[in-house]
Amino acid sequence: MNTMSHKFVLALDEGTTSARAILFDSDLNIVNIGQYEFPQHYPQPGYVEHDPEEIWEAQMLAVKKAISKIDAKQIVAIGITNQRETTVLWDAKSGKPVYNAIVWQDRRTSPITDWLKANYFKMIKDKTGLVPDPYFSASKIKWILDNVSNVREKAERGEIKFGTIDTYLIWRLTNGKAHVTDYSNASRTMLFNINKLEWDREILELLKIPESILPEVKPSSEIYGYSEALGNLIPISGDAGDQQAALFGQVAFNVGEIKATYGTGSFILMNIGNNPIRSENLLTTIAWGLEKNKAKYALEGSIFITGAAVQWFRDGLRAIDVSDEIEPLASSVEDNGGVYFVPAFVGLGAPYWDPYARGLIIGITRGTTKAHIARAILESMAYQTRDVIEVMQKEAGISINSLKVDGGAAKDNLLMQFQADILGIKVIRPKVMETTSMGVAMLAGLGVGLWNSLEELRNIWKVDKEFIPSMSEEKRRALYSGWKEAVKRAMGWAKVVGGQV
């Protein structure tokens, strides 16, 4: 083909362990992918850090590979999606980070968030949609300001910049000309008022964070600046946190549309439209904003362990040699033989939020084989997804009729069929599974007029396979009731027998 006549969008997907760059054409086909891993640093127990320079280098290597077969002049837009919450502070003049990036998994700031939880829980939840937790950026910023020499003084003089990874990459790509983020990433800092769409002064004062270090918050699709890094000026016109980008990439543009991403853990997001519904057991977050001072919201449920349970079955039990062996093994038995597996290795996330829960396999008899356990592991992913979706439907007052899926385990036909069966709704798997990158490519393309409407994007998006429920209501109820009983037995276990949380 004559690629010179083609227009391309470059999506930078900066994850927790690797930086990726994916090149899309104007029909949203993947043209090329570059991926480079970078290390995580663990200076002390509970500390998880990245070197921002290593992220930048890996990202640029990934870009180089992704665009190796085309002329960079054909790239009409760049979009950036990122691991959310991870925090970088850097010197405004030199651009040099003042400390390593503190990663979303880092728990060092628990004392700060315990204090917030005890004294300001309702205020923070009402304003930000989030619960006080080390996961979010706010306490990480405070820790760097309080613990790294001279940083607070420099911040108060306006000499320090803060950003989540999207902001840091945009700053680097534009040679320091743009210090911006989008609504979706801002909503994960625990400093952004999701009702007023502005940085919240009350929370900033509480944590003694100067507002001058924060980026300007813009819609998820507009030109933020121009990158010179590829040899010619290319507009950076899309920005969204990874899970929100995946929701957009699944063309979940309407209220009640929902997606599940199955990775090491799973993230389920439901589009709830223009009003930030308050939730007891889930997070309320900004999905995206396509216009200034207007946002679409989502309910989010995070499940800590899904794909990681397959890794444990492979590496911990050595029951299989490679992860792909679990599906044929699980398919070799007709059902789970009464076995349930609750993967509470690090407690349970949404909707239980029990840090004291521990993993459990129950229902074992003399006839149980490793195939039954394999099946129970796969089924646990589907049960946990139903747990979250039931709460979403109840709290949003929305009944859903289909679930869009992506991520590694979504390739597993047995699991996807069981997911449809246990939910009693259709499960839809898209042709392009790189929904995070595709979502931000869509946002970037919209930002420069490559596509002109959401309808146009919906028409480009293609289905790979639909899984239709075939299980009887009676069987569905019985299986799910067994799961709920198993979860009850797993909850609070570390409190009963002791052991570290």
Swiss-Prot record:
Binding positions for glycerol per the UniProt entry: R84, E85, Y135, D242, Q243
EC numbers for this chain: 2.7.1.30
Enzymatic reactions: glycerol + ATP = sn-glycerol 3-phosphate + ADP + H(+)
Pathway membership: Polyol metabolism; glycerol degradation via glycerol kinase pathway; sn-glycerol 3-phosphate from glycerol: step 1/1
Entry binding sites for sn-glycerol 3-phosphate: T16, R84, E85, Y135, D242
Coiled coil (UniProt feature): none
TM annotation in the entry: none
Gene Ontology CC terms, in alphabetical order: cytosol
InterPro entries per the UniProt record, alphabetical: ATPase_NBD, Carb_kinase_FGGY, Carb_kinase_FGGY_CS, FGGY_C, FGGY_N, Glycerol_kin
Binding site residues for ADP: T16, R20, T264, G307, G408
Residues binding ATP: T16, T17, S18, T264, G307, Q311, G408
Keywords: ATP-binding, Glycerol metabolism, Kinase, Nucleotide-binding, Transferase
Alphabetical GO biological process terms: glycerol catabolic process; glycerol metabolic process; glycerol-3-phosphate metabolic process
Pfam family, one: FGGY_C
GO molecular function, a single term: ATP binding
NCBIfam families noted in UniProt: glycerol_kin (TIGR01311), PRK00047.1 (NF000756)
Homology family: Belongs to the FGGY kinase family.
Record function comment: Key enzyme in the regulation of glycerol uptake and metabolism. Catalyzes the phosphorylation of glycerol to yield sn-glycerol 3-phosphate.
Protein name: Glycerol kinase
Organism: Saccharolobus islandicus (strain M.14.25 / Kamchatka #1)
Taxonomic classification: Archaea, Thermoproteota, Thermoprotei, Sulfolobales, Sulfolobaceae
Gene behind the chain: glpK
